[in-house]
A protein has these predicted regions:
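Short sequence/structural segments immediately N-terminal
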Residues: 1-3, 20-57, 68-71, 79-83, ...
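Surface-exposed patches in mature extracellular/periplasmic domains of secreted proteins
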Residues: 129-135, 200, 225-227
C-alpha cells in the first residue's frame, strides 16, 4: 500500500458485534469499542488462517511475507484492521501497478469477507486501533456535518465534494461517488490513508458521524432545488453561466436598441 498514495476519503460486508463503549481485547470475535455515534469492531480470530493465505497470495510480494514492508510497499504491522479494510474494499489494494504515484479507486479484487479475513490476519500481528467502523447515522446532525466538512475537508475535496488536483500528480478523490460508503468515509478520516491527514484526535466520533452523514447524504444525493446542478462543481460554474447569460442578454438588448435607432 504505497505511502505516496492519496486516498479519498468506505459499509460493505461488516457484521455488528455490539456497541461496547470501552475497548476490549483486540482481535477476539466480540471485540468492540466506540461510542453511541460509531462502534469499532475487529474480525474474529477464526478469520486469521484464511487471511494469512490471502495475504501471502495478494500482498506479500510488496509488503513482505510477515507484513514487515519492502522497497515496494510499507510495513503493515500495527496499522489496524480499519486501515486494511479501507484499502481493500476501495479496490486500491492489491495494486495493479505498485509504481503508480496514486492507486486509483477501482472495483475490489477481493470480496468483503476476504477483506475482513486479511484485516484479521494483519491485526493479529500487532493488535491496534482503528477497528472497522459501524456508523450509527440515525443520530447524525447533517447541518453540523456540512459545517465540519467545509472546515476540515473542502480544502482538498472542494466544497461540493467533487475532488481536486493536489501536488506531485496526485488528487483528492471525489466523494460524490455513490460507491463511497459510510464505513469507508470513517476509515479514511480515522486512518489518514497516504498523505491525507489523520483526524484521530481532532474530531470526535460524533463529529465524524455527522460528516459521514453529510457526505453519504447531501453530497451523494443532492436535491438541486435550482433545477440544474451544472455538473456539481460549485459556484465558479454557476457564476460563469450567470455572467454568460447576463452579458449575452445585455448585448442583445444593446443591439436591438441600436438597430431601432
Amino acid at each position: 500500500m504505497p505511502g505516496a498514495v492519496v486516498a479519498g476519503v468506505t459499509l460493505g460486508g461488516v457484521l455488528a458485534f455490539g456497541m461496547g463503549a470501552n475497548a476490549q481485547s483486540l482481535g477476539g470475535p466480540n471485540a468492540t469499542y466506540g461510542t453511541a455515534a460509531i462502534t469499532y469492531t475487529y474480525p474474529p480470530d477464526s478469520y486469521i488462517p484464511a487471511g494469512q493465505a490471502l495475504f501471502q497470495t495478494f500482498c506479500a510480494s510488496c509488503h513482505g511475507a510477515n507484513a514487515e514492508g519492502t522497497s515496494r510497499g510499507p510495513n503493515l504491522v500495527g496499522v489496524g484492521a480499519g486501515t486494511v479494510d479501507f484499502w481493500i474494499t476501495t479496490g486500491r489494494m492489491p495494486a495493479e501497478n505498485p509504481n503508480q504515484i496514486q492507486a486509483p479507486r477501482k472495483p475490489a479484487r477481493l470480496s468483503n469477507q476476504e477483506a475482513l479475513e486479511v484485516a484479521a490476519y494483519v491485526n493479529s500481528l500487532d493488535p491496534a486501533r482503528p477497528g472497522i467502523p459501524i456508523v450509527h447515522l440515525k443520530t447524525a446532525n447533517v447541518a453540523d456535518g456540512a459545517n465540519l466538512f467545509s472546515l476540515n475537508c473542502a480544502a482538498c475535496h472542494t466544497i461540493t465534494g467533487s475532488g481536486d488536483a493536489l501536488a506531485y500528480g496526485t488528487n483528492a478523490p471525489s466523494l460524490q461517488n455513490k460507491q463511497v460508503t459510510s464505513q469507508q468515509v470513517v476509515e479514511a478520516i480515522r486512518t489518514g490513508p497516504a498523505n491525507m491527514p489523520r483526524f484521530s484526535g481532532n474530531l470526535s466520533d460524533a463529529q465524524v458521524r455527522d460528516i459521514t452523514s453529510y457526505v453519504t447524504g447531501r453530497l451523494q444525493h443532492p436535491t438541486n432545488p435550482g433545477g440544474f446542478d451544472l455538473g456539481g462543481v460549485g459556484p465558479v460554474a454557476e457564476g460563469f453561466v450567470a455572467l454568460l447569460i447576463g452579458v449575452g442578454g445585455l448585448a442583445l438588448v444593446a443591439f436591438w436598441i441600436g438597430d431601432r435607432s
